[in-house]
Amino acid sequence: MIPEEIRAELQAHARAEAPNEACGLVVLRDGKAERYIPGENAVASPYRFELRTEPENWFLEDEGYELAVFHSHPSSPPKPSRADLERAGLWAARPWLILRTDTRELAAWRLDDGSATPIPLD
């Protein structure tokens, strides 16, 4: 579940980074988002992202949190692109949240072996 205040933060970050993709981490506990940690898109591209975040953010998982990878698609559907599927790497085991910036549509996915499975947001 993604509360409205977290959705608003995702939308604000996506708008601020447009026309490039924004990215960051959503911190979840028991399936509910508790906060958003904005990251930096190291490639500053409207077509792909490389998340740069402080290393200590990854240790939140050791404290019982789940981390979801967030990024925006400036004007394409909120589903994993070919680039997303090809570059999932170590993030494939985590939930992915994708926001279409121009419509504010948000979707969640689980990526595995080059395929994507939708995850309910409620």
What do these predicted ranges mean?
Residues 1-66, 75-122:
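Conserved beta-strand-loop surface patch within small alpha/beta domains used
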